[in-house]
Amino acid sequence: MADGRPAALDDFCRRFDISFFDLHLTCIFCSHTVDLQDLASFYLKKLSLVFRGGCYYACCSECLRLSARFEQENYFQCSIKAVNLEEVAQRKIKEICIRCICCLRLLDIVEKLDLLYSDQACYLIRGLWRGYCRNCIRKQ
């Protein structure tokens, strides 16, 4: 909210005095109305609203997956074993922001540690670290 505009859904609801259940936001990519389940997912993933052309936009789950795949295919920088991530990032694993490579959900500490102990890779995409969350790794 550096420019005064709310970026998080809860800030948006507070700022405009709207109940979460009454939100009607459009997907930035497909222009469909983002349903309540996808809005909840968007909120839990701690994603930011986009303000463009005087309107606020969110993103539906399907477009998030497509966006994640697009970024992986077009902005991939490198991959490293998770055991080397702390050394490369020069921060503790709990301090490193890692999103899921498939669904863009923020990984919690358990998922980050699972990356380490199961010898998985982490991927640098667009300057941000990615790995598999517990839901998407099962779908592989």
Swiss-Prot record:
Keywords: Activator, DNA-binding, Early protein, Host cytoplasm, Host nucleus, Host-virus interaction, Inhibition of host innate immune response by virus, Metal-binding, Modulation of host cell apoptosis by virus, Transcription, Transcription regulation, Viral immunoevasion, Zinc, Zinc-finger
SUPFAM superfamilies named among the record's database cross-references: E6 C-terminal domain-like (SSF161229)
A cellular-component GO term for this protein: host cell cytoplasm
Gene Ontology biological process terms in this record: DNA-templated transcription; regulation of DNA-templated transcription; symbiont-mediated perturbation of host apoptosis; symbiont-mediated perturbation of host ubiquitin-like protein modification; symbiont-mediated suppression of host innate immune response; symbiont-mediated suppression of host type I interferon-mediated signaling pathway
UniProt superkingdom: Viruses
Subcellular location: Host cytoplasm; Host nucleus
Main location: host cell
Zn finger limits (unnamed): 27-63, 100-136
Protein family: Belongs to the papillomaviridae E6 protein family.
Record HAMAP family: HPV_E6 (MF_04006)
Function (record text): Plays a major role in the induction and maintenance of cellular transformation. E6 associates with host UBE3A/E6-AP ubiquitin-protein ligase and modulates its activity. Protects host keratinocytes from apoptosis by mediating the degradation of host BAK1. May also inhibit host immune response.
Subunit structure: Forms homodimers. Interacts with ubiquitin-protein ligase UBE3A/E6-AP; this interaction stimulates UBE3A ubiquitin activity. Interacts with host BAK1.
Official protein name in the record: Protein E6
Phylogenetic lineage: Viruses, Monodnaviria, Shotokuvirae, Cossaviricota, Papovaviricetes
